[in-house]
Amino acid sequence: MKKIILIFLILSLNSYSQYNISGVIVDNTTMIPIENCKIIDILSKAEVYTDSNGSFSFMSNNKIIVSSPGYETKEVIINRDEHLTIYLIPTINKLEEILVKAASIPIEQKHATDAVSIINKKEIDRGNTIELHPILNKVAGVFMQHATLNTNRIAIRGIGARNLFGTANIRTYFGDIPLTDGNGESSIEDIELASLSKIEIHKGPSSSTYGVGLGGTILLKPTLTNYQESRASLSTSVGSYGLRRTVANVTKGGKKSNFNILYSNNHSDGYRVNNTYDRNTVTITAGVDTDNMNTFSIIASYINLKAGIPSSLNQEDFDTNPRQAAFTWGRSQAFEDIDYGILGITWNHQYSDKYTQYTSLFGSFRNNYEPRPFNILSERSNTLGIRSRILGKHTIHTKELTWNLGGELFFDFYNGRTFDNLYQDFPPGTGSVQGNQLSDLQEKRNYYNLFAETNLKLNNKLRFNLGLHLNQTFFDVNDQFLQDGINSSGTFDFNPIFSPKIGINYVINSNLILFGNIAHGFSTPTTTETLLPEGVFNPDIKPEIGWNYETGVRYKFLKNKIYGSISLYTLRVRDLLVTRRTVEDNFFAINAGKTNHNGIEGEINYTSTKTNYGQLNFYINTSLNMYTFDEFTDLEADFSGNNLTGVPKNIMNLGIDLISEKKFYANLNFQAVGEIPVNDANTVFNDPYELLNGKIGYQNTIKKHWKCNVYIGANNILDKKHASQLQINAIGFGGNAPRYFYPGLPFNIYGGININYRL
């Protein structure tokens, strides 16, 4: 009996033993330490808060609760003395969410001085998880057109809408790796959505640290594995028009290292003729904590893509048979075949509580073989770069000062060759046939960025943000094909461009926060745009320059049940680049005008009280776009006062989310897009249209380790005929009508299942 009592006493004492623990608490999506995070010991009720580096230490009896505004509360079991890394998952309430201020100075979104939108993992997974445009188009001020899965164009506040092909004038990054090439063009639609934990969009030229593109900055945050967590998942889905998708993901997290590998396979037969799509992607992220002062992280991704190009249609073909390909593009069986890889390694060194250094080495390669009716393009590109910055924190007479200082070097080595396409010399069905060489250009497209940014907190109400950015871009073109009698060789060094910004954030009360900023931005011409028709550099070409003026308010009421923001802005752009085509594949640019981008953006979110049945969330956002040509003369035509081409006058999104206590969930999104000018003369407009998308599903945890998610969804439920992308200012060659319109998908459905196993 005495032995039994003794054993009982020992066990009782052990169950209440105190453990000396320490650690750091970080954001699960950004890996940024969380300041002022609350840790409570359940038994003793003792509590402690993390410091500015997210660190803490205290005595615990067995179990702690970790909480912070904007994050899901987490419970952690303690059974020994140890150093912990604890990850918190951001909640939907975006005003409280921690963000990386353009990946430079961590700050809560409500205290940002610019208009910034955050798309978290739950919102990324809201649709079919293969298309990016439904995700971005729910953000006020952002409009992504999508001709096919491999042909897209993103505009932010009207900037980028007049680009002929793809996305330009917007800086994009995957982690710390630039997705924007030396020509200022970006292709983010090829990145696997399942590899993303977060998308951060800064509207306007307000990101000093990551370039000051006129439109703004898009930061794609890769999914990083939690330490001491291992899991595996498999997803498969099918949909209309031969859509098939498989995603496999394995993660392994130890005490000091983590590893995440994701593979995806995507296929679509396509809605149109010559519209097949195949993409395979492998994405790897890894991290190592060598000690308390140094961490290393790796991001790598390889993409193999082959997709048909049906191209745009004229009005008659769009109205009568939108599923056809443009005749010459279908006859030549045009396609693009891309191999694309990116790699980045980041070193994080903490010198002290006040100073931290972040240094990244990155590189990429891109090979593309692209037969078109007018020629066959074969191109290779290799990039290499380095970014380094130091983050400092100080307190000066009770005033909090945080600063960021650094630079970036970027080298882009490009080779593009074109060949005759002899498809017309062969029977229909043969497709493209490579002929004689037409051109061979080797290009070096390099730049450097120097940047500085600081946040000054004068008191709990008033904050200032100051930023400086210096850029210089260099082009070097070597023409390796002189048989055509044209030598396009030459160098073109743009003058250094200095871009300042100033921002302010003022807390009126617990419900209202004012913000505003003035920022300078620019966009350089591409190498093609700098060449005149005779093949020589245009010495008079200049970058587009703009100043953005903005003010807004962020609000929350009814205990955070209602929250949102309103922004008013004007962006004045001068030296507008106007593209002129001489033949189907030959165009150049001149500086020919000014534009005014005046707009209002509003967002309202409502979260209902959680009941035994579940919870409902509502949202509405709208963009009112008053974009015009201030001064614009092209040849003999004066377009001054016309509406800016390629941008709708208004966009509205309405949505509802249901999260049931019975494990069911559902969402519905309605989007209304106003009419869009298709040419600079404003003589052709794309009709307004409405889209209704929805998804329902069931997810449940089975025996603790297994989680299953089954869903079905539909896009364009109302089956509205619409043009999902426009070829602005199209010209009809050979007496043919201009081909302005890319048909959007009619009603289509998808469904799938995801199985997740967690150790």
Briefly describe each language-model feature range:
Residues 82-87, 132-135, 154-155, 170-173, ...:
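N-terminal periplasmic accessory domains that precede
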Residues 300-301, 398-404, 408-410, 441-573, ...:
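Structural signature of Gram-negative outer-membrane beta-barrels, strongest in the C-terminal barrel
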Residues 675-677, 698-759:
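C-terminal beta-signal and adjacent terminal beta-strands/loops
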Residues 26, 38-42, 67-71, 81-125, ...:
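Short, acidic, small-residue-rich periplasmic hinge/interaction motif at the N-terminus
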Residues 257, 346, 350, 356-362, ...:
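Membrane-embedded beta-barrel scaffold of Gram-negative outer-membrane proteins
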Residues 231, 238-267, 272-310, 335-350, ...:
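Transmembrane beta-barrel wall of Gram-negative outer-membrane proteins
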Residues 460, 472, 568-572, 590-676, ...:
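Gram-negative outer-membrane beta-barrel transporters
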Residues 57, 177-203:
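Short acidic/polar hinge/loop motifs at secondary-structure boundaries
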